[in-house]
């Protein structure tokens, strides 16, 4: 797509030619694309019942490549690096889903990627979830684990080996990794023994896998937060009951001023009654911490100065629902907006440029779906955008801020291309006690948006918006292939 006069965006060609995308689609051994709008019931069941083809995507620092997680035969998932200029596809990783599954892959430089896989395995008869980080080159070579290697003498088995907390923009192939350390037992008679324990931070060179310690591991630390510029500015501890050894739900947080290694008390967060400030993200450019804080019975968004004053400012509140997160952008990960969910997932941009761009793109993309800024190139000029809605399963686009052009990269469900999909309508269902229960009604194509009685419209589907107060989770307005 290209930006025309008056801010109108016009359609342009795809990055992947139809033949190239069809080849990738077929090579995955996923499913043959059925004839649009003319399929049999069996074909429709196959198309709607299959897994999403595109399961995740990231864009390289140059903006010239993407890494795409795609569904393959059976329960397998493949990670492919795709050159957007030549449409060349390089497979870099694959899991069979028995039990390992690829969760995500992201660029840590033009030639280096980090992926996470995991699954569920039985240990002593109990199902235990696990996740592990690996690094791999963009050509598929040099795949290696990033966490501490497993030891037969390890005191325990870790479910997670760590996480990437800073992608260190500008430092090719370098990342800050929050790393889990496990000490060894039965050390008698061994010359070399592991004694470190807990959560620490290492700067990892992905070429050599050599690590430079940034924060020494500690057993009581639950999290570290970086400012996106390579500096650890916030850390949190969990409080454990000394008698039972159980976690209490209380967390204490500390922060550092710029260019300082001295920790300063930030406060306590109680996850049981949700009092205190819960850290979400550090904006290094503003030198502030964005956090959730209970105000008027709802989680609001506040910003706390990290200059030593701890000056607090309320950024946004919502008297109906909780604000649940922030939206970040660019190599330094500056905060540009916040998120919440009512009848649908919503993003509010307090950055004027992105607010205007979001409005323009929403009008330009077919069916006017919900637009989210997924990732960006290192210079922030190439944006990876996801457009999705109730009648649009989702399509990834690349937007150039310099030329104001928008090009399609790949649809999430290509087998549904051209099919008329059912719309989803937010409604309120009255309960016997008069309380209104939020819900979603999936209406069959051709209903004209009218709500029928189930006897006259047996294909309509109703689902609750909330999944129960105990979990705090909820459904949202979106496309659901199985509804």
Across the structure, where does each feature detected by a protein language model lie?
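Solvent-exposed, flexible loop/coil residues
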Residues: 15, 19, 52, 273, ...
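Beta-propeller folds
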Residues: 37-383, 389-392, 399
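C-terminal segment of classical bacterial N-terminal signal peptides
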Residues: 24-35
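Serine-hydrolase catalytic core recognition
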Residues: 372-483
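Short, Lys/Arg-enriched N-terminal segments with co-localized hydrophobic residues
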Residues: 1-9, 36
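Bacterial N-terminal signal peptides that target proteins for export
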Residues: 7-22
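Short, intrinsically disordered, charge-balanced linker/junction segments flanking boundaries
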Residues: 34-38, 481-483
């Amino acid at each position: 797509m290209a930006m025309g006069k008056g801010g109108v965006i016009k359609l342009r060609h795809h990055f992947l030619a139809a033949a190239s995308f069809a080849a990738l689609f077929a090579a995955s051994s996923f499913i043959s694309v059925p004839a649009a709008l003319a399929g049999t019931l069996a074909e429709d069941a196959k198309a709607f019942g299959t897994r999403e083809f595109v399961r995740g995507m990231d864009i390289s620092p140059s903006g010239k490549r993407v890494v795409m997680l795609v569904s393959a035969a059976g329960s397998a998932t493949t990670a492919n690096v795709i050159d957007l200029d030549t449409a060349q596809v390089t497979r870099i990783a694959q899991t069979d889903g028995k039990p390992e599954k690829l969760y995500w892959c992201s660029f840590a430089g033009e030639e280096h990627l980090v992926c996470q896989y995991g699954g569920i395995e039985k240990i002593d008869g109990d199902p235990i979830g696990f996740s592990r980080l690996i690094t791999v080159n963009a050509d598929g070579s040099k795949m290696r684990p990033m966490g501490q290697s497993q030891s037969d003498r390890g005191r325990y088995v870790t479910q997670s080996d760590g996480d990437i907390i800073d992608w260190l923009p500008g430092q090719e192939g370098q990342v800050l990794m929050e790393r889990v350390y496990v000490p060894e037992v039965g050390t008698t008679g061994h010359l070399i023994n592991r004694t470190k324990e807990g959560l620490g931070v290492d700067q990892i060179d992905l070429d050599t896998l050599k690590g430079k310690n940034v924060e020494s591991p500690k057993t009581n630390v639950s999290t570290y937060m970086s400012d996106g510029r390579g500096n650890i500015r916030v850390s949190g501890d969990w409080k454990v009951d000394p008698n039972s050894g159980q976690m209490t739900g209380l967390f204490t947080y500390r922060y550092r001023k710029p260019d300082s290694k001295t920790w300063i008390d930030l406060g306590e967060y109680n996850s049981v009654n949700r009092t205190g400030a819960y850290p979400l993200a550090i904006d290094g450019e503003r030198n502030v911490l964005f956090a959730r804080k209970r105000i008027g019975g709802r989680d609001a968004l506040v910003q706390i100065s990290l200059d030593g004053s701890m000056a607090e400012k309320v950024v946004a509140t919502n008297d109906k629902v909780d604000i649940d997160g922030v939206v970040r952008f660019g190599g330094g990960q500056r905060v540009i907006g916040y998120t919440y969910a009512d009848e649908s997932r919503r993003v509010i941009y307090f950055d004027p440029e992105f607010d205007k761009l979001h409005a323009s793109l929403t009008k330009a993309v077919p069916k006017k779906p919900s637009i989210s800024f997924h990732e960006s190139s290192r210079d922030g000029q190439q944006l990876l955008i996801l457009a999705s809605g109730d009648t649009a399963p989702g399509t990834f686009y690349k937007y150039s801020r310099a030329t104001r052009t928008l090009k399609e990269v790949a649809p999430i469900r290509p087998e549904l291309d051209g099919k008329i999909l059912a719309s989803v309508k937010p409604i309120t269902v009255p309960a016997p006690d008069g309380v209104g229960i939020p819900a979603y009604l999936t209406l069959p194509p051709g209903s004209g948006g009218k709500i029928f009685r189930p006897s006259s419209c047996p294909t309509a589907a109703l689902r609750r918006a909330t999944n129960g107060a105990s979990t705090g989770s909820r459904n949202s307005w979106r496309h659901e292939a199985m509804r």
